Design a protein with these regions (language model features):
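Alpha-helix C-terminal capping segments
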Residues: 36-43, 59-72, 90-91, 170-177, ...
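Active-site/ligand-binding loops adjacent to catalytic centers
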Residues: 109, 113, 119-121, 175-248
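Short helix-loop-beta connector
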Residues: 39-49, 150-155
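Short, small-residue-biased leader/transition segments that mark boundaries at the very start
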Residues: 4-11
């Protein structure tokens, strides 16, 4: 979708809408891919219990797929994650284990590992290190972008949560368009990708507080740090100027887009 607010600048600023996925986000793609990959490998069986740390949207996707396929799912989340996301997961039948806010995603990951150890027939998708995460975006997200932009784009700008999205899409697009500039977006308060220290921040969905295993930094041309104020500002502008309700991480990406445009 081309954003109207940039048209007068002779710059085509396009946003890929993922809200039409069944669970309302891009994470539905990796939830299905990771579960079906494990099924094909015989790792996931009908009596398996899915346990996964999540900041929200992957949990929604896993709960949705688990409901359809008949799996029990336990999601481990920092207590700071939105109540709205938790309610949606509960509707799909998910169970919860909440971890202290100050421990961030690392705390949720550690707790999930503990639960896997003590729970019979437990399986964890491991979204931060599962190659099926990257594969899902190579096979679907990247191909859809190529269909819409057969002649390529100049910039790919997106936030980094698990690293699967930016890695999967960038690996495909850069092979076709070597001059593509790939920009990773992270919270100013927790600039781990830039070499900074992890810290709590309100931009849910990005900035896990560590560098994910599947994140390929060699594909990244630049990293932009976005403040919480700018993330909220552009999230609000997306609603008031484009009539699109996006998340705070989307606002962070749009703030990074604005920074890039200022340099052109």
């Amino acid at each position: 979708l081309s954003l109207r607010r940039q048209r007068q600048m002779c710059i085509r600023d396009s946003l890929k809408l993922e809200r039409t996925n069944p669970g309302g986000s891009i994470k539905d793609r990796i939830a299905l891919a990771m579960i079906e990959d494990a099924e094909k490998k015989g790792i996931l069986t009908p009596d398996s219990i899915i346990i996964e740390p999540t900041s929200g949207n992957t949990g929604i996707g896993l709960a949705l797929v688990a409901a359809v396929k008949g799996y029990r799912v336990i999601l481990v989340m920092p207590e700071s994650m939105s109540v709205e996301r938790r309610k949606l997961m509960q509707i799909y039948g998910a169970e919860f284990d909440l971890t202290p806010r100050e421990k961030g995603m690392k705390g949720a990951i550690e707790r999930a590992a503990e639960l896997v150890e003590i729970t019979p027939n437990a399986w964890t998708p491991g979204q931060f290190n599962n190659p099926a995460n990257v594969w899902a975006h190579q096979q679907t997200t990247a191909k859809e972008i190529l269909e819409d932009f057969p002649n390529g784009v100049d910039y790919l700008i997106t936030g980094v949560g698990t690293g699967g999205h930016i890695t999967g899409v960038a690996s495909v697009l850069k092979e076709r368009f070597p001059k593509l500039q790939v920009i990773a977006v992270e919270p100013e308060l927790s600039p781990v990708l830039s070499g900074g220290s992890p810290a709590p921040h309100p931009i849910q969905g990005i900035g896990a507080g560590f560098v994910p295993e599947i994140y390929q930094g060699n594909l990244i041309d630049n990293i932009i740090k976005v403040s919480k104020d700018d993330a909220f500002k552009y999230t609000k502008e997306l609603a008031t100027k484009e009539a699109i309700l996006g998340g705070i991480s989307t606002g962070a990406s749009l703030a990074a887009v604005a920074q890039i445009i200022d340099t052109l």
